[in-house]
A protein has these predicted regions:
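Metallo-beta-lactamase
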Residues: 26-92
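A short secondary-structure junction signal
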Residues: 16-19, 43-47, 101-103
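Cap/insert and terminal regions of metallo-dependent hydrolase folds
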Residues: 98-121
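A generic local structural motif
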Residues: 18-21, 62-63, 76-78, 100-101
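Active-site metal-binding motif and surrounding structural segment of the metallo-beta-lactamase
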Residues: 1-33
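Active-site metal-binding loops of divalent metal-dependent hydrolases
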Residues: 9, 37-38, 95-97, 116-119
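Active-site glycine- and acidic-residue-rich loops that bind
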Residues: 10-15, 89-102
Length: 121
C-alpha cells in the first residue's frame, strides 16, 4: 500500500492508523491524503453548536493531535482536489465535516465515487 485517503478525521476513519504497532508495519514512505481544511478544523474544532457527551470533544481533539504528531511527515494536504494516482482523485466537498472529501476512481470507461460519510451531513 502506497497511499491512504482519509475522507475525514473521525475516529472510525483514522483510528486504525493509531492502533499500537500499526505504524511500524506500514511503509515509511506511505502517503496520507487529507484536506487541509480538515486538519485545520481538528486543530481547534468549534463544538459550540453541537451537543456531545461530556469529555467527548476533548477525546476528539486528543485523537486528532496524536494522529497529526505521529503522521506529520506522511501527510499530503490539499486545498480542493488532488490526484492520488492515475485515475484516482480526491476532492474536498465539506458537509459531514469542514474538510470532508470524496474519492473518484476512473478505470477505462467505468467511474466510481466514494462519498465517505456524506450521508450523515
Amino acid at each position: 500500500m502506497t497511499d491512504v485517503v482519509l475522507t475525514h478525521m473521525h475516529m472510525d476513519h483514522v483510528g486504525g492508523l493509531l492502533v499500537e504497532g500499526v505504524k511500524e508495519r506500514l511503509r515509511p514512505d506511505l502517503r496520507i491524503h487529507v484536506a487541509a481544511a480538515e486538519i485545520k478544523f481538528w486543530e481547534s474544532p468549534d463544538f459550540s453548536r453541537t451537543s456531545m457527551p461530556t469529555g467527548f470533544p476533548d477525546a476528539i481533539r486528543s485523537t486528532a493531535k496524536r494522529f497529526r504528531e505521529e503522521y506529520q511527515s506522511q501527510l499530503r494536504l490539499f486545498d480542493d482536489e488532488q490526484q492520488v494516482a492515475p485515475g484516482v482523485v480526491v476532492r474536498r466537498t465539506g458537509g459531514h465535516t469542514p474538510g470532508h472529501s470524496v474519492v473518484r476512481v476512473a478505470s477505462g470507461g467505468d467511474r466510481l465515487t466514494f462519498a465517505g460519510d456524506a450521508v450523515f451531513a
